[in-house]
């Protein structure tokens, strides 16, 4: 949101106001109208490319620089963390920049388009170089499970961390919503950063209410001072 990317729960505008993202982002929708779904994702990819990392992304990168091991687990499918300079980023729901074959699931490649996408354009998906199947976005669609190796990596990181900072999550989308509870159960301190109180009342839990850009910037500056003080 603070980078200018609307959430799924925001009202879309223009052509896409007539299409529910939760219906477009399914395997069924892709089978029935691949050109519509592919056009939707290319349009979204174009919107993402216009966005810039915000102060929250930059603060997380700075924390990694001053604290050593900082891993980022994100539900976002954009590349703003990477463009901010973060290296250890795990995308639970996949990445918009990494398509794969709908038939054989082999990773594919899509060239970066410099032309401005027309909103609502119907675009035929490119083909897989191995089986000639249609390429689909490399993201987790509604009704699909997370990739097992990705979820396994996320669990390993959460179970072994000292501190988990949970930023902006609604607590609705599972299994990602379970990660703070898992960290608490393993003895980690959990810091919630949100505009509303989402804490669960655990003794090793901290609730920071406000915008992620402001709170993470202050937290990064505070940690830097503490770590660099004599």
From Swiss-Prot:
Catalytic residue positions: 93
Residue span, Deacetylase sirtuin-type domain: 1-226
Keyword Cytoplasm: yes
Enzyme class: transferase
InterPro entries: DHS-like_NAD/FAD-binding_dom (IPR029035), NAD-dep_sirtuin_deacylases (IPR050134), Sirtuin (IPR003000), Sirtuin_cat_small_dom_sf (IPR026591), Sirtuin_class_III (IPR027546), Ssirtuin_cat_dom (IPR026590)
Family per record: Belongs to the sirtuin family. Class III subfamily.
Protein name: NAD-dependent protein deacylase 1
Source species of the chain: Pseudomonas syringae pv. tomato (strain ATCC BAA-871 / DC3000)
Gene it is expressed from: cobB1
């Amino acid at each position: 949101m603070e980078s200018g990317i609307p959430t799924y729960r925001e009202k879309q505008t223009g052509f896409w106001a007539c299409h529910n993202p939760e219906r477009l982002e399914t395997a069924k929708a892709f089978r029935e109208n691949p050109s519509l779904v592919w056009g939707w994702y290319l349009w979204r990819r174009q919107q993402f490319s216009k966005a810039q990392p915000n102060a929250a992304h930059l603060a997380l990168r700075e924390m990694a620089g001053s604290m050593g091991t900082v891993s980022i687990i994100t539900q976002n499918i954009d590349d703003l963390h990477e463009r901010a300079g973060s290296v250890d980023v795990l995308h639970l729901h996949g990445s918009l920049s990494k398509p794969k074959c709908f038939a054989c699931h082999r990773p594919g490649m899509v060239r970066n388009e410099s032309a401005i996408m027309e909103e609502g354009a119907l675009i035929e998906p490119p083909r897989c170089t191995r089986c000639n199947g249609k390429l689909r976005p490399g993201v987790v669609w509604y009704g699909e499970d997370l990739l097992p190796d990705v979820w396994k990596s996320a669990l390993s990181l959460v179970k072994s961390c000292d501190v988990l900072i949970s930023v902006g999550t609604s607590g609705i989308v599972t299994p990602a919503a379970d990660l703070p509870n898992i960290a608490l159960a393993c003895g980690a301190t959990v810091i919630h950063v949100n505009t509303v109180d989402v804490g669960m009342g655990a003794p090793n839990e901290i609730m920071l209410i406000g915008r992620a850009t402001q709170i993470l910037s202050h937290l990064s500056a505070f940690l830097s001072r503490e770590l660099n003080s004599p």
